[in-house]
Amino acid sequence: MASEAERTFHRFAVFGESSSSSKEITNKNFSKLCKDCDIMDGKAVTSTDVDIVFSKVKAKNARTINFQQFQEAMKELGQKRFKGKNPDEALQGVFKLMEGKDPATTGVTKSTTVGGVDRLTDTSKYTGTHKERFDESGKGKGIEGREETTDNSGYVSGYKGAGTYDKKNQ
């Protein structure tokens, strides 16, 4: 049974830790293991209890615990979770809760569906000034669609006889 608990320990140790060798588990993943395996029930064992036990079993300046320290932590949490049982029975009860469990990814942000994107990028539904930026096929006009181009011909704006000067002098 300890081997199944060890496999669960390794699965949680590498969860979300790309640099982890699965030999040691961080406090974050230890808390996740306790929560996902229903060791932390919110009444007898709370997240505070889990953090305190983790700090108690780890070395002074370490940030992780190995499997042996993990077993000590589970023994302490087991006594809190299964009151009235001796430490070995409590440990076996905790290991039974851990059997076959994997890190859960519920509540993780999913990618959005395409429906909203299609609606927002349909240029045929654009109105006002945004409509001017695209031609009938939906292709962007580029700079002509974004800003009014100035007439640099030298004539005053609104002058009707633009381009007729050379024709009059000949």
Swiss-Prot record:
Cytoplasm found in the keyword field: yes
GO annotation, biological process: cell differentiation; microtubule polymerization; regulation of flagellated sperm motility; spermatogenesis
Family matches, as Gene3D superfamilies: EF-hand
InterPro entries, alphabetized: EF-hand-dom_pair, TPP/p25
Tissue expression profile of the protein: Only expressed in male reproductive organs, including testis. Expressed in elongating spermatids at stages IV-VIII of the seminiferous epithelial cycle in testis and in mature sperm in the epididymis.
Keywords for the protein's UniProt record, in alphabetical order: Cell projection, Cilium, Cytoplasm, Differentiation, Flagellum, Spermatogenesis
Cellular compartments per GO CC: cytosol; sperm flagellum
Keyword Cytoplasm: yes
Residue spans of biased composition, Low complexity class: 105-117
Disruption phenotype: Male subfertility with a significantly decreased sperm count and motility. Sperm shows increased irregular mitochondria lacking lamellar cristae, abnormal expression of electron transfer chain molecules, lower ATP levels, decreased mitochondrial membrane potential and increased apoptotic index.
Main location: cytoplasm
Biased composition (Basic and acidic residues): 129-149
A Pfam family per the record: p25-alpha
Cellular location(s): Cytoplasm, Cytosol; Cell projection, Cilium, Flagellum
Disulfide bridges in this chain: none
Positions of the UniProt region annotated as Disordered: 105-170
Listed GO MF terms: tubulin binding
Family indicated by similarity: Belongs to the TPPP family.
Function: Probable regulator of microtubule dynamics required for sperm motility. In contrast to other members of the family, has no microtubule bundling activity.
UniProt protein name: Tubulin polymerization-promoting protein family member 2
Species, as recorded: Mus musculus (Mouse)
